[in-house]
Amino acid sequence: MRRIITGHNQEGKSVITIDGPPARSIGEDVGGLFEIWNTNGSPIDTRDSHDRADSEIILSPSPNGTKFRYFQINPTPEGVPWEILQDAAAEAFERIGAAHHRIDTSKHPAMHKTETIDYIILLQGDVSLLLDEEEVRLQPFDTVVQRGTNHAWVCLLYTSDAADE
């Protein structure tokens, strides 16, 4: 994945300040979470070349901040016991400072609730969005505005050529 961040030079001309891979990633063995850009609610300084995504990966943004990230989930292998899935999800959420967001995991081990608005575009694969009372199956290029609800993402089928369809 290539990430291009723009800004301004000392003369006020637009330039590329970062051209390369995401600054940080985590969980690549099960798909991965890749940090693209973060804001913390402070005024924007477009002459600053600091990589705002090069910090510890935490699920939720700081107050008045934002997070722009790419994530991928792989299908859950069949036959994995519920307890193993619960333990793996608990460890994964702990690693990104989000254990406290797992308020009700009775429907799925990855269920979590944040006080954020999340914008999701499914690029490839076959994914279900699980909610407390409903489930919706997503196809490539479906979009979701997730508004602070208890939810989980479940990959039903991953295909590397789904984006080409």
Give a label for each model feature.
Residues 131, 138-151:
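Conserved metal-binding segment of the jelly-roll/cupin
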Residues 26-28, 58-62, 80-85, 108-114, ...:
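Short histidine-centered beta-strand/loop micro-motifs
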Residues 108, 112-139:
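A short beta-strand-loop-beta hairpin characteristic of the jelly-roll/cupin
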Residues 69-114, 148:
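Conserved short histidine dyad/triad with adjacent acidic residue
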Residues 158-165:
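Conserved small/polar residues in nucleotide/adenosyl-binding loops
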Residues 13, 126, 150-152:
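Structural motif
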Residues 1-56:
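N-terminal leader/capping segments at the start of a protein or of a new domain
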